[in-house]
Regions:
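Flexible, glycine-rich beta-alpha linker
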Residues: 32-34, 59, 76, 80-110
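Hydrophobic positions on the long internal alpha-helix
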Residues: 8, 12-16, 70-71, 127, ...
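Conserved Rossmann-fold NAD(P)-dependent oxidoreductase catalytic core, especially the SDR/UDP-sugar
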Residues: 10-57
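Conserved C-terminal active-site "lid" loop/helix of NAD(P)H-dependent oxidoreductases
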Residues: 105, 144-171, 187-196
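Glycine-rich NAD(P)-binding loop of the Rossmann-fold in SDR/ketoreductase-type enzymes
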Residues: 3-11, 19, 62-63, 119
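Alpha-helical substrate-binding/gating segment
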Residues: 79, 94-108, 118-144, 153
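Catalytic helix-loop patch of NAD(P)-dependent Rossmann-fold dehydrogenases
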Residues: 3, 37-83
Length: 198
């Protein structure tokens, strides 16, 4: 199935070039580099940045990283006689309002992940619009290609959004720790009670 999805991504890029589309904005996934989360949760790494080698330990993430790398080949123009396609890859975090409601107080790493991955609706809209409308997305080598993490301005972030702020002016307005303060307090109280008793 994932091989079919990679072929589909190729067809999307190729069709964009053939039809004269200037830019493809692709919803990738944080799973394109999800292997690094193992290092984060074992305290061997603090942040994942979009410029790190995309490493995944599963087929889904592998397919997403393959879309991204294929997009880079199209952005260079190397696969279409010099016809470059601008490509933005959006590694979306957790665009759900329910993750904390389902959190297990005995798994605080999962709670941390839910808080760090959160992407509010209004931040997602801004993120996508700016990815489409920003005039110049060229990287430091002049290639019109970017990978951005899509998360809100969360205190618990473990994916860097610095390049999205710099390149497209992404300015997220929401913070999961503030938005879900009541839910977080209840989870932490439950975890404390479970660990130390009432």
């Amino acid at each position: 199935m994932e091989l079919d999805n990679v072929k589909m991504a190729h067809n999307v890029y190729q069709t964009c070039v053939e039809e004269g589309v200037r830019r493809a904005v692709i919803f990738s996934s944080n799973h394109a580099a999800d292997y690094y989360e193992n290092l984060i949760w074992s305290d061997r790494m603090e942040f994942v940045t979009p410029d790190m080698l995309p490493l995944s330990d599963n087929y889904y993430g592998w397919a997403k990283s393959t879309y991204e790398l294929l997009g880079f080949a199209f952005a260079t123009g190397g696969v279409n006689d010099g016809k470059a396609l601008e490509v933005v890859q959006l590694r979306i975090g957790g665009p759900r309002e329910t993750d904390l409601a389902n959190a297990n107080p005995d798994d605080l790493n999962r709670v941390h992940r839910s808080l760090g991955a959160y992407l509010s609706v209004r931040d997602q809209l801004q993120f996508v619009v700016k990815s489409v409308e920003t005039d110049d997305i060229a990287d430091e080598n002049g290639v019109p290609f970017q990978v951005f993490y899509g998360v809100s301005a969360n205190d618990h972030n473990f994916w860097s959004i610095a390049n999205a702020r710099r390149v497209i002016g992404y300015d997220p307005q929401d913070n999961s720790q503030v938005k879900f303060a009541n839910e977080l307090a209840a989870i932490l109280q439950s975890a404390k009670s479970s660990q130390y008793g009432d």
